[in-house]
Amino acid sequence: LVSLNESQFARELQKDFVNFYEPSTVNPYIPLAAKGPWIITTHGAVVHDNGGYGMLGMGHDPTEVMSSMSKSHVMANVMTPSVTHKRFADTLKREVGHTRGACPFDRFICMNSGSESVTVAMRISDINARLMTDQEGPHQGKEIWTVALDSGFHGRTDRPASISSSCLPKYQKKLASFRGKSNVRFVIPNDIHGLKQVFSDADREGAFVELIAMEPVMGEGNPGLMLDREFYDQAISLANQHGTLILIDSIQAGIRGQGCLSIVDYPGFED
């Protein structure tokens, strides 16, 4: 295999796998070793890798992280109480909210992936939408809309995919289950007028906006684009006025772009 040129070698290595990303996004080299921002390829190249949207800011093979992960951690899932659960929760509470003096969250939910996390968040939103639109609810009988940002990406499972502008057109074109789905309204990031217009349209057409989904630092769809505080404040204001929930989806790109776990610690968002 190593006698092949690098592009042939790469194709041979991945021929047994389905790659659902665009061919142009596949890296044109094969890493042999990596540390920090540096990669050595199988064919002798030295690559300086500044990192993609999902890369931790610590670079490749960070010594402290790898050392901690290699230790024995006695912890099962949430059905089995563990001392490590308490240790982990205390660590989260110290980290999340460290710029504002205290953690603003009472409890945490741990999921297996970003897409599953968004699915659970949207399930919570779904419960609220049911309460709002059921008989005797404040928005009884109204059509339900969701609002998300143009070029956003929230996952490839069903509901997260339905609010992911970056890949939704392909799903609508190819998937029967996405045929006719039209209850999502997309807004250009940081377009306050556009956001207000969606809520005006909802009021005029008798719809209830169940959710505003936002990435504070955008990932796959528009890597690195950040929310303005003014746009965020307007979204919160509209949500409070209409009984809408806010979903802040900060899983990979947020850590990479800001170096912290939650928007509550981003510069300008500490309050």
Where in this protein do the model-derived segments appear?
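Glycine-rich loop-to-alpha-helix module at the N-terminal edge of alpha/beta enzyme cores
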Residues: N19-F20, V46-Q135
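Active-site-adjacent loop/helix segments that line or gate small-molecule/cofactor pockets in enzymes
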Residues: L1-P37, G54, S72-V74
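Acidic, glycine-rich active-site loops and adjacent beta-strand->loop/helix elements
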Residues: H73, V83, S115, D150-H154, ...
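Residue-level recognition of short loop/turn positions
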Residues: T41-H43
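Conserved PLP-enzyme active-site core in the AAT-like
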Residues: S164, K174-L175, S182-I188, I192-D271
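General beta-strand structural signal in soluble alpha/beta enzymes
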Residues: V47-N50, I109-M111, A148, I246-D249, ...
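Generic structural signal for well-ordered, non-membrane alpha-helical segments
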Residues: E6, A10, L32, G36, ...
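PLP-dependent aspartate aminotransferase-fold enzymes
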Residues: K93-A213, E230
